[in-house]
UniProtKB/Swiss-Prot annotation:
The keyword Cytoplasm applies. Residues 88-100 have a biased composition (Polar residues). Pfam families: HYLS1_C. One of its GO terms (cellular component) is non-motile cilium. Residues 64-106 are annotated as: Disordered. It comes from the Eukaryota. PANTHER family: CENTRIOLAR AND CILIOGENESIS-ASSOCIATED PROTEIN HYLS1, HYDROLETHALUS SYNDROME PROTEIN 1. This is Centriolar and ciliogenesis-associated protein HYLS1. Belongs to the HYLS1 family. GO terms for biological process: cilium assembly. The gene is HYLS1. Its main location: cytoplasm. Keywords: Cell projection, Cilium biogenesis/degradation, Cytoplasm, Cytoskeleton. Plays a role in ciliogenesis.
Amino acid sequence: MAQRRRSFSIGEAVEELVGPDGQKWADMDPEERMLVAAKAFPHICAGHGEGDVRREAQSTLYDPYSKASVTSGKQPAFPAQLHHPHTESNGASEAVSETSQRLRKPVMKRKVLRRKPDGEVLVTDESMISESESGTENDMDVWDLRQRLMNLHFQEDRESPVDVSQKFSLPREYQGISQDQLICYLRREEMGPPAYEQDLIVASRPKSFILPRLDQLSRNRGKVDRVARYFEYKRDWDSMRLPGEDHRKELRWGIREQMLCRAEAQSKPQHIYVPNNYLVPTEKKRSALRWGVRCDLANGVMPKKLTSFPLFPS
């Protein structure tokens, strides 16, 4: 009973939308078609027992961390209407595909503070790109055009060009653009949904990954030993040479080669040692005389009389 009631509600909505013979839908202009399809779309979704398929598909498609995540194994899928484009090819499916939901993109605010090696503080705003409602509506129109073009390419082999031109109708702002120009524009847009800033990141490198900088390695210069600092300065000095400066290492090796090419050095004559008998004048003789007099007095030896020099002159 529930199944019969659901099918009846879907048929009633389609009949009200298209008309008994399809003449009502053909007589409408694009604006009226959009208005009628927007009113009938919730009834058709309720008849299927599903919610807003477009919103669910976009919630899966616009996951900002799905492409940047390393552990995520799920790939973003197209909306459910693109997986089975041949299931609904009547006027109701075309009317549903023309409806564009005015969704506002979610905004995630994220500010990151980083410190440079010189101590400067750098604050970067890594929030997702948020656009106005007009920009969102324009992106949704482009995405809707992509859907219809993909359905058109799938069905153009089965249908004639006249039927395709009758079923595929562009919005008012795209009426003056040819189909080839529109295909080139969509290919230039890479046939994908509106991209966020997070979608531009390589999947193998998350946004939270920061590449190490070489100048940060010399931040703890006080902990480096003197030998490493000497070689660092020497490498910097060798890399920045003055114009016209001689390479001292090459000059030294050249002089060393010249020294090795010479003959053996002549031997110097040996020094002949000559003994020196010079006696430095000191008090050694006087002290020796005193020591002799003391020894004679201790032994009771009388000193010799000097006959030539009388002790007591007359």
